[in-house]
Amino acid sequence: MSALKIKKGDRVVVLSGKDKGKTGEVTKSFPKDAKVIVSGVNVATRHRKPSQANPQGGLERVEAPLHVSKVAIATADGKPTRVRFEVKDGKKVRVAVKTGETING
């Protein structure tokens, strides 16, 4: 299995689906499933039963995971770019294909 090219804290653009074109920050990643959760994107409504923790119950809006193929890292100007790995100074770093700049993290 190859390394996940998108990590927590990355700014990404949604490439397809109902939220196409929206940008957000990755809040959580699931490398084994190749999925990420992006803030404010792919929001689903869950019906919650009343419980001791939540005595009121009701509707709850939750961000659902997206497959990594549906998102791309956003450049400084907000456009999507692919990512490749390079070895610089003995360290494996992520590099934006369009701009050639190193992605932090």
From Swiss-Prot:
<dbReference type="GO" id="GO:0003735">
    <property type="term" value="F:structural constituent of ribosome"/>
</dbReference>
<comment type="function">
    <text>One of two assembly initiator proteins, it binds directly to the 5'-end of the 23S rRNA, where it nucleates assembly of the 50S subunit.</text>
</comment>
<dbReference type="Pfam" id="PF00467">
    <property type="entry name" value="KOW"/>
</dbReference>
<keyword id="KW-0689">Ribosomal protein</keyword>
<dbReference type="GO" id="GO:0006412">
    <property type="term" value="P:translation"/>
</dbReference>
<dbReference type="InterPro" id="IPR008991">
    <property type="entry name" value="Translation_prot_SH3-like_sf"/>
</dbReference>
<dbReference type="Pfam" id="PF17136">
    <property type="entry name" value="ribosomal_L24"/>
</dbReference>
<dbReference type="GO" id="GO:0019843">
    <property type="term" value="F:rRNA binding"/>
</dbReference>
<dbReference type="InterPro" id="IPR005824">
    <property type="entry name" value="KOW"/>
</dbReference>
<keyword id="KW-0694">RNA-binding</keyword>
<comment type="similarity">
    <text>Belongs to the universal ribosomal protein uL24 family.</text>
</comment>
<dbReference type="InterPro" id="IPR014722">
    <property type="entry name" value="Rib_uL2_dom2"/>
</dbReference>
<dbReference type="GO" id="GO:1990904">
    <property type="term" value="C:ribonucleoprotein complex"/>
</dbReference>
<comment type="subunit">
    <text>Part of the 50S ribosomal subunit.</text>
</comment>
<dbReference type="GO" id="GO:0005840">
    <property type="term" value="C:ribosome"/>
</dbReference>
<keyword id="KW-0687">Ribonucleoprotein</keyword>
<comment type="function">
    <text>One of the proteins that surrounds the polypeptide exit tunnel on the outside of the subunit.</text>
</comment>
<protein>
    <recommendedName>
        <fullName>Large ribosomal subunit protein uL24</fullName>
    </recommendedName>
</protein>
<dbReference type="InterPro" id="IPR003256">
    <property type="entry name" value="Ribosomal_uL24"/>
</dbReference>
<dbReference type="InterPro" id="IPR005825">
    <property type="entry name" value="Ribosomal_uL24_CS"/>
</dbReference>
<keyword id="KW-0699">rRNA-binding</keyword>
<dbReference type="InterPro" id="IPR041988">
    <property type="entry name" value="Ribosomal_uL24_KOW"/>
</dbReference>
